[in-house]
Amino acid sequence: MAHRKRQSTASSMLDHRARPGPIPHDQEPESEDTELPLESYVPTGLELGTLRPESPTPEEQECHNHSPDGDSSSDYVNNTSEEEDYDEGLPEEEEGVTYYIRYCPEDDSYLEGMDCNGEEYIAHGAHPVDTDECQEAVEDWTDSVGPHTHSHGAENSQEYPDGHLPIPEDDPTVLEVHDQEEDGHYCSSKESYQDYYPPETNGNTGGASPYRMRRGDGDLEEQEEDIDQIVAEIKMSLSMTSITSASEASPEHMPELDPGDSTEACPPSDTGHGPGRQEARPKSLNLPPEVKHPGDLQRGLKTKTRTPEERPKWPQEQVCNGLEQPRKQQRSDLNGPTDNNNIPETKKVASFPSFVAVPGPCEAEDLIDGIIFAANYLGSTQLLSERNPSKNIRMMQAQEAVSRVKRMQKAAKIKKKANSEGDAQTLTEVDLFISTQRIKVLNADTQETMMDHALRTISYIADIGNIVVLMARRRMPRSASQDCIETTPGAQEGKKQYKMICHVFESEDAQLIAQSIGQAFSVAYQEFLRANGINPEDLSQKEYSDIINTQEMYNDDLIHFSNSENCKELQLEKHKGEILGVVVVESGWGSILPTVILANMMNGGPAARSGKLSIGDQIMSINGTSLVGLPLATCQGIIKGLKNQTQVKLNIVSCPPVTTVLIKRPDLKYQLGFSVQNGIICSLMRGGIAERGGVRVGHRIIEINGQSVVATAHEKIVQALSNSVGEIHMKTMPAAMFRLLTGQETPLYI
């Protein structure tokens, strides 16, 4: 590769600043659709299944190719020729892929749920749609929803292997966008960003990948129906009307799509190359229009930034169609109040994920049009990973990618020196183009596209010193893929290995690059909301956070557990071979100390004979073994192991069998943050006012504001909770204990 002369020191310092610069695309990609099954989720975190990903297809360039083995983690530089497939050994039809990206919101979006008889729990989400007419004019999103409030399986998610490298001594900024995974919680990270994509407003059309996924008209129609229905539900939530009433609403209140809007949303883009790199770039990231070289004027791509009013709107017919089939909710979500025509509309709020503006170094308008950073491309490699790697493992993977690329560079340099006695040039100067639609890597000299990734395919960004690691999902077909390698036959989804492509760059502005990509996700989501007539400020949770911060945690539990009079150490006598004679149940997720509760005692058994224990007591430890945080089955096993002992030492906290809950809700617009089914609390939003008030998953509601609800219908319980303002007093107990005490279950003593 020709070695380009570096700029002067002053120019070089300016050269690394970002500048707006729309990057053209060689051709329009065909849209790709996949079936999107509806799963359920509590809308406290943002998780989106993305559509129509584009395979990162680097164009030809003068560099050394290191083709990876299909089933290994071989290093390679991401430069391929027409004769080589990007992933050696994969058939051409595998180039189409559905990627699933999960947004990990801030701490208030952790979800813990329990399966209540398997009924669906439906919430609202945003879904992508593609149209043949506009090709890539509208990029919206879909949430996968399913029978668990916290489960989001993505068949075709791709993740990467657990590395064993030390965490870097530097304190790198990490921007993380997770895949959808079937795990029990959402990842919380203040450096995570929402993965939503607005319509193509900057003229940046799809990448130039020659590989396309075949799509049937039936799939498109099904997908559009789901998307339209969900977008309609979002709008309904924001207008505070129920699904039933909204389905009967007058059509004139629905947005319409003029034929002109569709044309405006997807202006044809000319094939060409982006502007060349300038010798000096502005110092500020609030950038004026750049001056192009004469040779670049012919290659420039004209873009237009549209106002929210000009962006595509959803057709009236599609919105109405989505409302004609209201879903039967077996669980009632109390993240927002249920519908009540007697309540003023202004008092209701959407149960839709909050919008959190992510600060960054760029102006939103610049990110929509696209900005460019100067960098040196060091190389690429691929890794394998499980579906659900932790944040630490992600960081190790980034370190592993850097190590591999550096080893590869060193080997290439030695080889070049051996072949040609001169000094070898192993760095490639590139322009890193970042927008709300995609990330492109352009050769700085020729402006040829080396890599092109849709923003939604980016799963992880890390800056380590002056190194930037960009991780993107690999292609994966709908059927079983060679990209998915099971370590053992019949391995679970979480144990499968998935491929990921890692690009490594070097730049003085590594931190700015990482921050800008993270900011791009936030701006993309904001644009998506506006394009669908939703004001992001309506989803802001700032006031809600302020209310939460004024409330005490766990009601009076802290005082009760810290009172030494309630903490007792007991010594029980029993005969050898005799069971303790107790039934224990879980205290419920959300309790200050997750342990087991004494739910029943056998008449004449050692526990009952002692007279020292009461139903409702929480057992902290047995014979010095702590039970706090252990699964119920483990605790039961420890108790069963006492059979051959004659003395048992227990540490307990005396508690009444009924838990008192106090929820402070100043206004109906503040969500309660839990869901109920048949009087049982099924899920709970971490950090919400319900958790702070003492609500626990798995508890049955016995009383609300002094009124017994034991024999009350589910709908009336939900209505009572949804319409309650001020202090909401509840009494609850573990559902299993309630069934034992009411004779619905026969106790199995241990």
From Swiss-Prot:
On this chain, the residues bearing Phosphoserine are 11, 209
Query: From start to end residue, where is composition biased (Acidic residues)?
Result: 81-94, 219-228
Q: In which tissues is it expressed?
A: Specifically expressed in neurons, predominantly of the cerebellum, hippocampus, and spinal cord. Lesser extent in neurons of the cerebral cortex and anterior thalmic nuclei.
Q: Which domain of life is it from?
A: Eukaryota
> What region holds the PID domain?
367-556
Domain PDZ: from-to ranges: 569-654, 660-736
The record's annotation in InterPro entries points to: APP-Binding (IPR051230), PDZ (IPR001478), PDZ_sf (IPR036034), PH-like_dom_sf (IPR011993), PTB/PI_dom (IPR006020)
Q: Where is this region: Disordered?
A: 1-94, 143-346
An example Pfam family from this entry, by short name, is PDZ
What are the start and end residues of every segment in region (STXBP1-binding)? 185-271
Q: Name one GO cellular component term.
A: Schaffer collateral - CA1 synapse
Sorted UniProt keywords: Phosphoprotein, Protein transport, Repeat, Transport
**Membrane-spanning parts:** none
Question: Briefly, what is this protein's role?
Answer: Putative function in synaptic vesicle exocytosis by binding to STXBP1, an essential component of the synaptic vesicle exocytotic machinery. May modulate processing of the amyloid-beta precursor protein (APP) and hence formation of APP-beta.
User: What is its quaternary makeup?
Assistant: Part of a multimeric complex containing STXBP1 and syntaxin-1. Binds to the cytoplasmic domain of amyloid-beta protein, and to the nuclear factor NF-kappa-B/p65 via its PDZ domain. Interacts with the N-terminal domain of NECAB3.
| Notes on the domains | Composed of an N-terminal domain that binds STXBP1, a middle phosphotyrosine-binding domain (PID/PTB) that mediates binding with the cytoplasmic domain of the amyloid-beta precursor protein, and two C-terminal PDZ domains thought to attach proteins to the plasma membrane.
Name this protein carries in UniProt:
Amyloid-beta A4 precursor protein-binding family A member 2
Q: What is the lineage of its organism?
A: Eukaryota, Metazoa, Chordata, Craniata, Vertebrata
